[in-house]
C-alpha cells in the first residue's frame, strides 16, 4: 500500500480547518490479527512510528503494548513466532500496539509524512547475533490515501478512520526480481488521544473472611493492592508493605491433596476483631506446593499502636479455605524504610528444623513506612530517590522479563572485590533467615555502615523485548546514600525472572549485566544548581558486562532519574511525568566516568582475585548464616568508618586546594577585566557624548516636526472654518435667490403692464387720428364756402400762427392744444427712456450674487435691496394712479369727441376754466424728467407726478 497523496475530495485548506491534526495528540491503534511467512523459520515483527521527512521524529511518541502501561518509545517488537509450514497464518501474543503521537507529528503541509514502518526480522542466527531484516511494509498514518476515506469531521469520541486490511511484506533486497516474503492481517483505528480509561467492574470486591473467598475474589482484591508511587504513609499512620515472592515445600491439605494457595496479610488488631483484610494476593493458576506470586499488599496501622501491633501472614488453600501456614512479625523490631528480605522458616510440630520435611520457607520483602522520613545527625539530606524507567532500545536476545537489584555502595572498589570473591552479601539479593518462633530481636538489626549497601528488588519488567519498570527506590541518608564521594556509586544488577522459579527461588544465577553510576561530589553540586527538584536525569546509562544485544547489535542502555530529598515530608516524588523535567546529565561527562569504570572493572577484579587467592578460604566457610554482632565486627566497622572519614577529609582538602586555585584564577581574571573596563571608559565616554549629540539633533528634528504638524493642524482648522462660512453663506443665499425669483416675476408683470400701456398708446394715437379726422370734417365750411374754393381738412385749419382753427374758422384755444401736445411728448419720452434702461437693469440684477465677497458688502446689498423693494412699491402705486388718470382722461376725451359729433359745444368759458388744471397737469408731467435714475428693479416711466411722492422717493434714496 503506497501513499498517493492527500484525499482528492477534500482540499488541504479545508482538511486543515476541520481536522487541525497538528494541534492535537492522536492515537494509532494497530493490531496484528495474523501473520504468515513463505519460508520456515523464527520470525518477529518490528513496528515503528516515524516521519522520514523529519529528523528525530520519534521524540515524544508514547507506546502501549496490549493492556500495559504507556512508555516513551516509537518502535516495538512482537513476540517470536516459529513458522513451520510456509504460508500458514499465525497469531501473536503481543499483537496490539497503541502509538500516541504528539502534537505536530501529523501535518498536511508536504513536509511531514507520518507512517508506520513494519519490518520482518528473522531470528535463526546464533544467540547474540543481530537479527536479519527480511521484509518490510509501509502503512501511511497521515495524510491518508483516498481509499478508504478519512472522516475529517470526526468528533473527539469518533474515529478518523477504522478498518481491517492486509499488508504485503516485501523482501528487503536489492534484487529487482525479489517478491514478498509474507503478509499480515491487521485492524487499525486512528482517533484523538482519549487517555487511559478506568476499568469498569460489574460489582465491587466483597469484603469478607479470606476463607470464604472464591478463586476469583483474591484476584479482584489483589488489583487494589498495587504499590503507590509515594513512599510515605498517611498522617498519623504507618504502612507495612509486604511483597510475597513465593514459597517452597508448602504442607499438603488435611486430605493429602495439593494446595491451591494464596496469602492473606493483616494486623493483630484486625485478627482480634475478626475483621476481613483487603491485603490478599492472587491465587495460583494451578494447585502447587511451590507457588510464585510476586504481589505487593499494604496493611495500615495507627502510628501510636506500632509498638503493640504485629503483622500476620497466612497461607490459605482456596478450595478448602484451610489455613496452611501462619507467621507473625513484630512491627516494633522493623527499622523504618529499610527493606527486609526474609526467608520465613517455620518448623514442624516435632520441632526438628533440620529435617527436610520441616523446611517450609516463605519468601517475602517487608518494608515499614512512616508518615515522615527520620532525620539523622550528620546528614544534610533525608534520602536519595532513584527512579528506574526502563530499557531504551528493543532487545533481540532476551526471552524473559528482567528484575533489577538496586543498591548504593559507599566504596565501589571494595564492592567489586567482594563480587569477585563471590561474597554472598554482594552477589544477588542477601536473604535474612527468620525462624519461628523468633529467637532474638537481633535478627532485625541493621548495621550502621554496610559495605554492600541496602539492596532493593524491583518488580519484573516486561515485555521481554523492551523491559519497562517505572519503579522508585528510596535510600536513606543513614545508609550513606546521600554522602557523595569519589568512591560512592549506584549499582544496578539485572537478573532474569526465571532464576526465581523452582525449589529455590532466591538462588539467583549469574546476572545478565550491571550498570554503575558514580555518585561523586561534582554530581552533587550539579544536582543542587538545578531549578525545581534537586535531581538529574540520565538518558542512556549503559549495561556493562552483558550478553544482551539490541536489535541494532549494540549494548543496551537504561534511563533513570534521581533526586535528593531534604524534607521530612516531601511533597513530590519522582514519577514518569515529572522525571522528564529534570536537567539531563551531560553524556560526555557520564561517558568519561563510565569508561574509567569499564577499564578498571576487569583489572581490579583480576588483581583482587590474585591478592586474595593466597589467603585461607576458611574465612568464607566459617561465616555463619545469621549475622553475629561480635566485638571484632564492631571494631572493623569503626575502622571502616574512620577510614571513610579520613578519605572524606583528604577529598575535602583536595577540593579546598582546587577551589583555592580556581579562586586565584578568578581573581586574576577579575583584575584583568577591571583593567579592560578602565581602558574602555574613555571610549564609552566618547560614545556617550556622540549619543547625546545625536539625541539632541533628533530632539530638534522632533521639535520642527511638531511645529510643522501644529501649523498644518491650524491650517486645517482655518480651512474647516472657511468651509463652514461658505456653507452658511450658501444657506443664507437660498432665501435671497427665492426673493430674486419673486422680483423677476414682478418685473415680468411690469413688462406686461408696459405692453398694455403701449397698446393704450397705440389706441390713443388711433383715437387722436380719428379725432383729427373728425375735427377736420367739422372744420369744413358749408358747401357755400366750398364753392368759394376753400379746402377741406379733417383737422382744424391752422392759422397763421400755427394754431388749429375751429369749425367756424376761428382759432382753437392755445392752452388746450398745448396741453395735448405736451402730454403726448411726455409719454413718448418716458417710453423711450424705459426701453433704453431695461437691458442694463436686468444685467445688473444677474450680477448681484457675484458681488457678495464679504459681510459688509452683504449688509450694503441687503439695505439696497430693501430700498429697491420700497421703490418698487412706490412705482407700482404711481403706475396704478397714472393708469387711472389716463383712463379718466381717455374717457373724457371720448366723451368730448361724442359731444362734438353730436353737435354739442361747450361754452368758451368752460374751456378757460379747465385750462388751469390742464396747465397744472402739464407741469406735473414734466416732473419725472427731473427724478434721479431709478434702481434696476424700478420703472422710470411709471413715476407719479405728485410732489409728495417725489419727496418720499428722494428721502429713501438718501
Swiss-Prot record:
<dbReference type="GO" id="GO:0005777">
    <property type="term" value="C:peroxisome"/>
</dbReference>
<feature type="coiled-coil region">
    <location>
        <begin position="632"/>
        <end position="774"/>
    </location>
</feature>
<keyword id="KW-0175">Coiled coil</keyword>
<feature type="region of interest" description="Disordered">
    <location>
        <begin position="602"/>
        <end position="628"/>
    </location>
</feature>
<protein>
    <recommendedName>
        <fullName>Coiled-coil domain-containing protein 33</fullName>
    </recommendedName>
</protein>
<dbReference type="Pfam" id="PF00168">
    <property type="entry name" value="C2"/>
</dbReference>
<dbReference type="InterPro" id="IPR039889">
    <property type="entry name" value="CCD33"/>
</dbReference>
<feature type="coiled-coil region">
    <location>
        <begin position="859"/>
        <end position="899"/>
    </location>
</feature>
<dbReference type="InterPro" id="IPR000008">
    <property type="entry name" value="C2_dom"/>
</dbReference>
<feature type="compositionally biased region" description="Polar residues">
    <location>
        <begin position="907"/>
        <end position="920"/>
    </location>
</feature>
<dbReference type="InterPro" id="IPR035892">
    <property type="entry name" value="C2_domain_sf"/>
</dbReference>
<feature type="domain" description="C2">
    <location>
        <begin position="214"/>
        <end position="353"/>
    </location>
</feature>
<feature type="compositionally biased region" description="Polar residues">
    <location>
        <begin position="949"/>
        <end position="958"/>
    </location>
</feature>
<feature type="region of interest" description="Disordered">
    <location>
        <begin position="899"/>
        <end position="958"/>
    </location>
</feature>
<feature type="compositionally biased region" description="Polar residues">
    <location>
        <begin position="602"/>
        <end position="617"/>
    </location>
</feature>
Amino acid at each position: 500500500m503506497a501513499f498517493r497523496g492527500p484525499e482528492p475530495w477534500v482540499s488541504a485548506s479545508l482538511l486543515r480547518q476541520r481536522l487541525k491534526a497538528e494541534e492535537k495528540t492522536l492515537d494509532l491503534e494497530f493490531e496484528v490479527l495474523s501473520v504468515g511467512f513463505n519460508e520456515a523459520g523464527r520470525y518477529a515483527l518490528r513496528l515503528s512510528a516515524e516521519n522520514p521527512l523529519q529528523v528525530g521524529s520519534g521524540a515524544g511518541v508514547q507506546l502501549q503494548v496490549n493492556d500495559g502501561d504507556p512508555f516513551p518509545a516509537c518502535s516495538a517488537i512482537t513476540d517470536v513466532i516459529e513458522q513451520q509450514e510456509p504460508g500458514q497464518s499465525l497469531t501473536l501474543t503481543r499483537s496490539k500496539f497503541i502509538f500516541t503521537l504528539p502534537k505536530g507529528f501529523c501535518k498536511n503541509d508536504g513536509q511531514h509524512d507520518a507512517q508506520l514502518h513494519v519490518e520482518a526480522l528473522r531470528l535463526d542466527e546464533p544467540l547474540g547475533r543481530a537479527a536479519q531484516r527480511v521484509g518490510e511494509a509501509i502503512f501511511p498514518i497521515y495524510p491518508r490515501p483516498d481509499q478508504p476515506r478519512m472522516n475529517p469531521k470526526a468528533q473527539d469520541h469518533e474515529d478518523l478512520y477504522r478498518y481491517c486490511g492486509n499488508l504485503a511484506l516485501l523482501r528487503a533486497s536489492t534484487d529487482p526480481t525479489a517478491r514478498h516474503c509474507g503478509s499480515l492481517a491487521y485492524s487499525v483505528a486512528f482517533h484523538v488521544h482519549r487517555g487511559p480509561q478506568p476499568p469498569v467492574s460489574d460489582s465491587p470486591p466483597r469484603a469478607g473472611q479470606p476463607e470464604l473467598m472464591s478463586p476469583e475474589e483474591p484476584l479482584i482484591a489483589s488489583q487494589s493492592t498495587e504499590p503507590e508511587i509515594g513512599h510515605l504513609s498517611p498522617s498519623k499512620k504507618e504502612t507495612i508493605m509486604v511483597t510475597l515472592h513465593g514459597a517452597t515445600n508448602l504442607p499438603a491439605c488435611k486430605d493429602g491433596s495439593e494446595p491451591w494457595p494464596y496469602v492473606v496479610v493483616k494486623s493483630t488488631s484486625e485478627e482480634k476483631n475478626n475483621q476481613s483484610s483487603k491485603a490478599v494476593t492472587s491465587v495460583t493458576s494451578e494447585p502447587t506446593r511451590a507457588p510464585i506470586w510476586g504481589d505487593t499488599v499494604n496493611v495500615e496501622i495507627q502510628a501510636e499502636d506500632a509498638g503493640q501491633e504485629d503483622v500476620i501472614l497466612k497461607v490459605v488453600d482456596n478450595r478448602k479455605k484451610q489455613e496452611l501456614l501462619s507467621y507473625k512479625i513484630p512491627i516494633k523490631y522493623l527499622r523504618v524504610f529499610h527493606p527486609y528480605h526474609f526467608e520465613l522458616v517455620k518448623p514442624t510440630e516435632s520441632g526438628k528444623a533440620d529435617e527436610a520435611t520441616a523446611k517450609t520457607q516463605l519468601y517475602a520483602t517487608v518494608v515499614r513506612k512512616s508518615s515522615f522520613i527520620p532525620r539523622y545527625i550528620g546528614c544534610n539530606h533525608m534520602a536519595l530517590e532513584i527512579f528506574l524507567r526502563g530499557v531504551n532500545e528493543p532487545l533481540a536476545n532476551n526471552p524473559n522479563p528482567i528484575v533489577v537489584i538496586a543498591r548504593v555502595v559507599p566504596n565501589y572498589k571494595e564492592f567489586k572485590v567482594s563480587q569477585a570473591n563471590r561474597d554472598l552479601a554482594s552477589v544477588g539479593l542477601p536473604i535474612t533467615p527468620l525462624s519461628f518462633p523468633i529467637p532474638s530481636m537481633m535478627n532485625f538489626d541493621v548495621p550502621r555502615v554496610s559495605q554492600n549497601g541496602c539492596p532493593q528488588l524491583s518488580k519484573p519488567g516486561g515485555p521481554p523485548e523492551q523491559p519497562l519498570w517505572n519503579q522508585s527506590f528510596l535510600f536513606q541518608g543513614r545508609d550513606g546514600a546521600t554522602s557523595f564521594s569519589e568512591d560512592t556509586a549506584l549499582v544496578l544488577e539485572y537478573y532474569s525472572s526465571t532464576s526465581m522459579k523452582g525449589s529455590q527461588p532466591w538462588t539467583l544465577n549469574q546476572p545478565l549485566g550491571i550498570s554503575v553510576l558514580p555518585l561523586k561530589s561534582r554530581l552533587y553540586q550539579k544536582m543542587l544548581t538545578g531549578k525545581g527538584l534537586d535531581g538529574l536525569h540520565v538518558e542512556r546509562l549503559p549495561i556493562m558486562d552483558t550478553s544482551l544485544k539490541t536489535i541494532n547489535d549494540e549494548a543496551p542502555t537504561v534511563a533513570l532519574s534521581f533526586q535528593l530529598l531534604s524534607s521530612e515530608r516531601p511533597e513530590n516524588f519522582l514519577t514518569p511525568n515529572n522525571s522528564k523535567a529534570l536537567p539531563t546529565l551531560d553524556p560526555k561527562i557520564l561517558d568519561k566516568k563510565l569508561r574509567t569504570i569499564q577499564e578498571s572493572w576487569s583489572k581490579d577484579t583480576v588483581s583482587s582475585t590474585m591478592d586474595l587467592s593466597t589467603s585461607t578460604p576458611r574465612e568464607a566457610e566459617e561465616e555463619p548464616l545469621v549475622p553475629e554482632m561480635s566485638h571484632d565486627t564492631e571494631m572493623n566497622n569503626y575502622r571502616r568508618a574512620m577510614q571513610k572519614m579520613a578519605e572524606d577529609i583528604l577529598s575535602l582538602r583536595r577540593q579546598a586546594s582546587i577551589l583555592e586555585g580556581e579562586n586565584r584564577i578568578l581573581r586574576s581574571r577579575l583584575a584583568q577585566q577591571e583593567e579592560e573596563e578602565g581602558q574602555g571608559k574613555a571610549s564609552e565616554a566618547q560614545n556617550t557624548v556622540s549619543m547625546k549629540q545625536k539625541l539632541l539633533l533628533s530632539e530638534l528634528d522632533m521639535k520642527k516636526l511638531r511645529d510643522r504638524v501644529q501649523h498644518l493642524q491650524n491650517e486645517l482648522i482655518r480651512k474647516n472654518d472657511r468651509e463652514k462660512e461658505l456653507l452658511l453663506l450658501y444657506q443664507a443665499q437660498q432665501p435671497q435667490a427665492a426673493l430674486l425669483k419673486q422680483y423677476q416675476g414682478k418685473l415680468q408683470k411690469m413688462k406686461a403692464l408696459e405692453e398694455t400701456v403701449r397698446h393704450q398708446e397705440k389706441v390713443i394715437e388711433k383715437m387722436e387720428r380719428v379725432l383729427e379726422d373728425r375735427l377736420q370734417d367739422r372744420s369744413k365750411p358749408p358747401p357755400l364756402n366750398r364753392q368759394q374754393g376753400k379746402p377741406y381738412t379733417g383737422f382744424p385749419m391752422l392759422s397763421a400762427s400755427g394754431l388749429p382753427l375751429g369749425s367756424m374758422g376761428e382759432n382753437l384755444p392755445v392752452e388746450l392744444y398745448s396741453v395735448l401736445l405736451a402730454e403726448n411728448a411726455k409719454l413718448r419720452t418716458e417710453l423711450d427712456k424705459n426701453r433704453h434702461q431695461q437691458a442694463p437693469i436686468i444685467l445688473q440684477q444677474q450680477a448681484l450674487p457675484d458681488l457678495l465677497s464679504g459681510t459688509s458688502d452683504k449688509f450694503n446689498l441687503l439695505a439696497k435691496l430693501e430700498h429697491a423693494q420700497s421703490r418698487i412699491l412706490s412705482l407700482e402705486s404711481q403706475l396704478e394712479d397714472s393708469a387711472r388718470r389716463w383712463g379718466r382722461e381717455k374717457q373724457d376725451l371720448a366723451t368730448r369727441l361724442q359731444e362734438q359729433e353730436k353737435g354739442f359745444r361747450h361754452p368758451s368759458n368752460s374751456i378757460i376754466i379747465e385750462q388751469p388744471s390742464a396747465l397744472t397737469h402739464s407741469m406735473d408731467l414734466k416732473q419725472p424728467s427731473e427724478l434721479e435714475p431709478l434702481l434696476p428693479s424700478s420703472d422710470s416711466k411709471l413715476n407719479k407726478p405728485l410732489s409728495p411722492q417725489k419727496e418720499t422717493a428722494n428721502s429713501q434714496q438718501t
